A protein has these predicted regions:
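Enzyme catalytic cores with a strong preference for nitrogen-chemistry domains
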Residues: 1-148
Length: 148
């Protein structure tokens, strides 16, 4: 499996510009022969999004933009792994999760929230994100794969 790592320079909160960069680099990666293109943690939203994750409107816009990326990527053969902010399960103590989604064949085929949230030095993720309770494998081009 040929994997491309797309280290993009995104902007916190600028969902549309970040989505455009993701799609541009996805096309470039596929042209270079990649079967999977992996983007950074929180590539869609920018890192660190801090208090933006406390606004339901931001979470809703993020979900809509992630779906728009999936729709635009429908013509690609390569699968994309995109970091984004997801809504936590109902009744969670914190409303957002730091997550990764697999986009394949124009749809979001898998999503996983981060389990181990750093909370030291410059990291304050436990303040803003709900950790995942478990981790599942995804399938990339017929192969079971872990995304951490």
């Amino acid at each position: 499996m040929r994997i491309a790592l797309a280290q993009i320079n995104n902007t916190v909160g600028d969902l549309e510009a970040n989505a455009a960069k993701i799609l541009d680099f996805a096309r470039r990666g596929e042209q270079a022969g990649a079967e999977v293109i992996a983007f950074p943690e929180l590539a869609l939203t920018g890192y660190p999004p801090r208090d933006l994750v406390e606004k339901q409107s931001f979470l809703d816009r993020t979900a809509a933009t992630l779906q728009a990326v999936a729709d635009e990527a429908a013509g690609l053969r390569a699968a994309l792994i995109v970091g984004y902010v997801a809504c936590s399960p109902p009744n969670a103590a914190i409303r957002a999760q730091n997550a990764a989604a697999v986009i394949s064949n124009g749809r979001i085929s898998w999503s996983q929230a981060k389990m181990l949230l750093p909370n030291y030095d410059v990291f304050d993720e436990a303040r803003y994100f709900q950790s995942a309770a478990s981790q599942d494998l995804c399938e990339l081009h017929g192969r079971k794969t872990a995304v951490t």
